[in-house]
C-alpha cells in the first residue's frame, strides 16, 4: 500500500496516501474560541474553510515549533488539515510490516513500521477521532 512518510517533532509518521488530498504551505490559521487544544483553528483554502488539527497535541506530545506544511486529509466528503513539519517521501509499505504496538495511543495509530537506520514510524489511523 502507498503511504506518505512525514516528520513532526523529530518523529516519523506514516499515513495512507489514499487519505491525503494534498500538502500545502502553512497559511494563517484563525483560532476558534472554546475549541479543544488540538484544534488549532480554521483556514481558508481556495474558498473552502477547513479545520486544522495538531496531531502532537491530540496525542499529548509537545507542540512542534516548525510546522511548515498542512496535510489536507479526506474521509468520505470531509476534509481536515493536519499540521506537519515536512513530507519526506511517498513509499510502498507491505501491510504485513505494520507491527501492532500496545504502547501507542490506539485511538490514533494502527501500529509502527521499522524503516531501518534506527527509524520507526507510527502509522496514523484516519478515523472518527480525527474526523
Each PLM stretch: what is its role?
Residues 1-131:
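An acidic, low-aromatic, low-complexity terminal/linker signal
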